[in-house]
């Protein structure tokens, strides 16, 4: 299969190198110097230092050439950008008449409109007259570094197109990666977005030294918040028990490679948000979309106390320790996700 990955950050590079073990893969990056460095050294020293990339992976600095590579039904374009870059890259893909199949990897809500990635893509395709494209999301618990190292992982592709799900499985379900299929695109995307916000909370708890019991409580009640919002938006409850819900939440909330968890830990240690983001070097989607998640919850009448507390810590100056006190002082209630 011919595959073009658009975006040479950590995740795009890792997935492209994985796919290149079995397919004809081109990795496009907008930074020509980075593309040249990867071609010369067979590594992405900026985002995945010290990890060799597959010998057959090819690199391209011209988007038109990368899209030429992925034309026709038996080909796939993968958009590997943060949510903020999704619309622009989708416009570029839509302008190329030969592309038929597109998936994206980003997780989050648009901070301005509150739109999920599939809604952003659908809006662009409607504007450009490309509703013929088969589209979907690939998501799940997967740190880019571990994928690049060839360590095992499992993911989910979500799309209304069974053919696209099957094609995506063929592209990536090999070697150390398993790919499951789902038609619950809303549920898959909500899980991938909300877990980033919740990971900030668990990181803060760990940074405060609150222990493993507190972490378990936050993950479990956070999952309830995710499920409440996701079902209110049209997702299926069982989706949140799977890889893109509980699975991704567990990884992001507890793994030391998690950028969102790192933000929470460092906030608890007294660093300012601006300082943390300046030194992080990567996007922390939980910070970008926390307000959008909270606004959607309030608009839908969904109770999300952990998420609301994260927003107050991030943007209103609430001390993490005070946020914990508030959560602990909430009235007793029956355990429920509703």
Swiss-Prot record:
Superkingdom assignment: Bacteria
Catalytic residues as annotated in Swiss-Prot or TrEMBL: 195
Residues that, per the record, bind NADPH: 11, 30, 107, 144, 259, 283, 285
Pathway where this protein functions: Membrane lipid metabolism; glycerophospholipid metabolism
Location (main, coarse): cytoplasm
Catalysed conversion reaction: sn-glycerol 3-phosphate + NAD(+) = dihydroxyacetone phosphate + NADH + H(+); sn-glycerol 3-phosphate + NADP(+) = dihydroxyacetone phosphate + NADPH + H(+)
GO terms under cellular component: cytosol
GO BP term, example: glycerol-3-phosphate catabolic process
Gene Ontology MF terms in the entry: glycerol-3-phosphate dehydrogenase [NAD(P)+] activity; NAD binding
Compartments, record wording: Cytoplasm
Any Pfam family matching the protein: NAD_Gly3P_dh_C
Family: Belongs to the NAD-dependent glycerol-3-phosphate dehydrogenase family.
PANTHER family: GLYCEROL-3-PHOSPHATE DEHYDROGENASE, GLYCEROL-3-PHOSPHATE DEHYDROGENASE [NAD(+)] 2, CHLOROPLASTIC
Stored NCBIfam families: PRK00094.1-2, PRK00094.1-4
Name listed for the protein in its UniProt record: Glycerol-3-phosphate dehydrogenase [NAD(P)+]
UniProt organism field: Ralstonia nicotianae (strain ATCC BAA-1114 / GMI1000) (Ralstonia solanacearum)
């Amino acid at each position: 299969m011919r595959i073009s990955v658009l975006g040479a950050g950590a995740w795009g590079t890792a997935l492209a190198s994985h796919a290149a073990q079995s397919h004809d893969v081109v990795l496009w990056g907008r930074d020509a110097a980075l593309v040249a460095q990867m071609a010369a050294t067979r590594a992405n020293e900026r985002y995945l230092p010290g990890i060799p990339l597959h010998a057959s992976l090819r690199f391209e600095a011209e988007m038109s050439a990368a899209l030429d590579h992925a034309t026709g039904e038996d080909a796939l374009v993968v958009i590997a950008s943060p949510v903020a870059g999704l619309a622009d890259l989708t416009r570029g893909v839509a302008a190329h008449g030969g592309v038929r199949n597109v998936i994206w990897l980003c997780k989050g809500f648009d901070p301005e409109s509150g739109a999920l990635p599939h809604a952003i893509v659908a809006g662009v395709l409607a504007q450009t007259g490309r509703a013929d494209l088969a589209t979907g999301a690939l998501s799940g618990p997967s740190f880019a570094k571990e994928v690049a190292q060839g360590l095992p992982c499992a993911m989910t592709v979500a799309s209304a197109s069974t053919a696209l799900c099957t094609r995506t499985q063929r592209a990536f379900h090999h070697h150390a990666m398993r790919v499951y299929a789902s038609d619950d695109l809303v549920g898959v995307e909500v899980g991938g977005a909300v877990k980033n916000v919740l990971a900030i909370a668990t990181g803060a708890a760990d940074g405060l030294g609150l222990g493993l019991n507190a972490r378990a409580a936050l993950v479990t009640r956070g999952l309830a918040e995710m499920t409440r919002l996701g079902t209110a938006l049209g997702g299926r409850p069982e989706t949140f028990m799977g890889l893109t819900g509980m699975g991704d939440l567990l990884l992001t909330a507890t793994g030391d490679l998690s950028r969102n968890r790192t933000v929470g830990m460092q906030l608890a240690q007294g660093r300012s948000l601006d300082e943390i983001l300046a030194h992080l070097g990567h996007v922390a989607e939980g910070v970008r979309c926390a307000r959008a998640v909270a606004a959607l919850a309030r608009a839908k009448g969904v109770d999300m106390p952990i998420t609301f507390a994260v927003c107050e810590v991030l943007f209103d100056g609430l001390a993490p320790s005070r946020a914990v006190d508030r959560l602990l002082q909430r009235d007793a209630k029956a355990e429920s996700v509703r």
